[in-house]
């Protein structure tokens, strides 16, 4: 087995491998950090590489913390019955991973989100690492593997559901029977997709 296969096997079931102990120690530190943190190198090198990361200029890796559970909506100021407040049981219709990608994109508006992956969770939070690319960097522009991201069509791609997590949330992994309301978009089908 090659190095990447060993890493992948260890991360398949973190609690049973050496990753579990490492994660416990890391999370103590991660909880005290800001929500969005730029990091030097990926925690899961195998996953990052398979999702398009390269150790070269123009690539940035960001760790994002997202609160678990449904959406906490702002409280109404006007009077009403507590049951009609509309505070609870309103999910954001997006995965936490997609939300993490959006947080990273807002923090670094000059970069585009390439992809992301899970790195840990506890009772309150989930952590994701987001691979970001600088579309204006000459190294990125001259690399035929990633130069597509410099095009106008990919500007703000995470906010339009064009990343892998976004496409999954929009139901675009399914086709055929049962997926009639998925394409061309959720909005075009008047929200019947979800």
Curated annotation (Swiss-Prot):
Q: Which InterPro entries match?
A: Rbsml_eL15_core_dom_sf, Ribosomal_eL15, Ribosomal_eL15_arc, Ribosomal_eL15_CS, Ribosomal_uL23/eL15/eS24_sf
Q: In its keyword annotation, does this UniProt entry include Ribosomal protein?
A: yes
Q: Which keywords appear in this protein's UniProt record, sorted alphabetically?
A: Ribonucleoprotein, Ribosomal protein
Disordered, as annotated region: 164-194
SUPFAM superfamilies the UniProt entry points to: Ribosomal proteins S24e, L23 and L15e (SSF54189)
Does the record carry Ribosomal protein as a key word?
A: yes
Compositional bias of kind Basic residues? 167-176
What is the superkingdom listed in this entry's lineage? Archaea
Output the Gene Ontology cellular-component terms. cytosolic large ribosomal subunit
Would you kindly state one Gene Ontology biological process term found in this protein's UniProt entry? Answer: cytoplasmic translation
What Pfam families does the annotation carry? Ribosomal_L15e
User: Which terms does the record give in the GO molecular function aspect?
Assistant: RNA binding; structural constituent of ribosome
The similarity annotation says: Belongs to the eukaryotic ribosomal protein eL15 family.
Matches recorded under HAMAP family = Ribosomal_eL15
**UniProt-recorded name of the protein:** Large ribosomal subunit protein eL15
To which species is this protein native? Thermococcus gammatolerans (strain DSM 15229 / JCM 11827 / EJ3)
């Amino acid at each position: 087995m090659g190095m990447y296969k060993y890493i992948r096997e260890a991360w398949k079931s973190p609690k049973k491998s050496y990753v579990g102990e490492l994660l416990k120690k890391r999370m103590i530190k991660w909880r005290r950090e800001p929500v969005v943190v730029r990091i030097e190198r990926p925690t899961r090198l195998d996953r990052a590489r398979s999702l398009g990361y390269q150790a070269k200029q123009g690539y940035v890796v960001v760790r994002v913390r997202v609160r678990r559970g449904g959406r906490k909506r702002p409280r109404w100021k006007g009077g009403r019955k507590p049951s009609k407040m509309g505070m609870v049981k309103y999910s954001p219709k997006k995965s936490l991973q997609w939300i993490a990608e959006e947080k990273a994109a807002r923090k670094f508006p000059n970069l585009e989100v390439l992809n992301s992956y899970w790195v840990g969770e506890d009772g309150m939070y989930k952590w994701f690492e987001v691979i970001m690319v600088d579309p204006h960097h000459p190294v990125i522009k001259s690399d035929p593997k990633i130069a597509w991201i410099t095009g106008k069509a990919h500007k703000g791609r995470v906010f339009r559901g064009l990343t892998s997590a976004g496409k999954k949330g929009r139901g675009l992994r399914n086709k055929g029977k049962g997926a009639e309301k998925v394409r061309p978009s959720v909005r075009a089908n008047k929200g019947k997709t979800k």
